[in-house]
Amino acid sequence: SSYAGLFQAKVKDKPRPDTHQVEAIEAVKSKLQSLDRGQMIMACGTGKTFTTLWIKEALNAQTILVLLPSLSLLSQTMREWAWAGNTDFDILNVCSDKSVGKKTEDMDPSDTPFPVTSEVDEIARFIKTPKPKVIFCTYQSSQLIAEAQLDASVPAFDLTIADEAHRCAGKA
């Protein structure tokens, strides 16, 4: 038997929006012309991660905040956006747990396969850069974003995506 096939990785084509995703993108674009916020609800497995990326691109948003409930979802979303994006953007990952990404008795930097920051000044500098940029941040670390934006010279985000927001919002 031959092992040659084991080492021939197929390069996946970048995904393209399905009909339901195109409809969602157009609906969000339309609503955001008259409203400053909205809610997109899609069933599990229907491509929310890519749909939000394509919304960012359709809106030509330059400074984006993506809030996520866990580091594992942050990692997955960041990787998928970086791979599937049709436009270049810089990435900053924010995590308030200062031990993440550092070698400790209980953790190795390889446990978190991407660099993170918990430094408010670094976050503020990143937001001020004149390039397209995305900050991926856990909900638990969002206070660091708020602190960075206390500086009046730090611009607002063009678009904020709060993934799984229903898990952290109360009912009125």
Q: What kind of region is each of these model predictions?
A:
Residues N93-V120, T138-L144, R167-A169:
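Conserved helicase motor
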Residues T46-G47, S72:
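ATP-binding Walker
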Residues L59, F89, P130, P155-A156:
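Structured loop/turn residues at beta-strand edges in well-structured enzyme cores
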Residues Y139-S141, D151-A172:
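SF2 helicase catalytic motif II
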Residues S1-A43, F50-Q62, W83, T104-D111, ...:
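ATP-dependent helicase/translocase motor core
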Residues N60-N86, L92-V100, Y139-S141:
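Conserved Walker A/P-loop ATP-binding site and its immediately adjacent core
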Residues E26, S75, L144, G170:
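Alpha-helical elements of the RecA-like P-loop NTPase motor core of helicases
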Residues K128-A146:
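Conserved two-lobed SF2 helicase motor
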